[in-house]
């Protein structure tokens, strides 16, 4: 049981104030602090302090003793800590993304390797052979887009902009998955005069349309005034998560984080296919091949937790990670698992005890627990988030 020393990622879309206001993390340079990373990702591993006072990378510590740190099942299955845990602070919209499924990730990675595409090339889609399932848990009101709306909903929303592009009129005639695929690709392929004309029709509609998703389009247009991704809120569900609500992001499903602070848990992968709201490379044929053009009602997007005493367990449909929340104010609790775990203090104060060892976590602080350690006794006043594996 060791306290983690974590790193902050400074991406342009990040908030300059959220991590300071929530967790007292200093920002003397006033940089955008987008993400606090907890884990053993090779790009930026957390660090731990050993018994002799030396600070080492968590990734290196795990590498030296995988079975003890990860548990036999996780070590055999993944060979590394299979998840990355983050605090994500979005002050402005992130790009619309799609994550390929596991099989397509393996095929795409092998294909790009065989083609000799450098790992850091702009046109590289697959950085590894893994899928990238994600869970987002809102700490503040959190605005996002996730999955295609029901076709009847898309039809009614597209009516005011029917003249923007022929593919819109085409979809309105026969609203099905095939024509949604054509519409999605056509909007992304727009260039020059065609794109200017379409965006002019959309922006004119903003003058007469009220409420959502038009308000979200207005917000996004402040940052991406000339991006064809401005049509996306008409096609995708706009989701407002309240603090404490969570949502799982499936493979082959377009999504975007727009504003707010959340905990995010994800598999260890950097495979992203972009689909708008970005100046970066968009591989449209590869993107379309990796998207399921099927509707998902907004009411089905939230992940409902299962309550057991003071624990809320959020069901995850993959083995790469599990996520639960522990309310220490309700009762003292014993936390144990057959895998590694990262515990994060969401609010209040958590006191962790194991044998003679005592560790206090304040809001924003986290600890790593190895698979071979006995259960930890957790008490205090706040809430503790736990990421681990159920293998």
Model-derived regions, located:
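A short hydrophobic beta-strand segment most commonly corresponding to one strand
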Residues: 94, 134-144, 260-279, 321, ...
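Short acidic-glycine-tyrosine-enriched beta hairpin
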Residues: 88, 236-249, 253-258, 263, ...
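C-terminal, non-catalytic macromolecule-binding modules
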Residues: 261-313
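Transition-metal
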Residues: 1-209, 279-299, 323
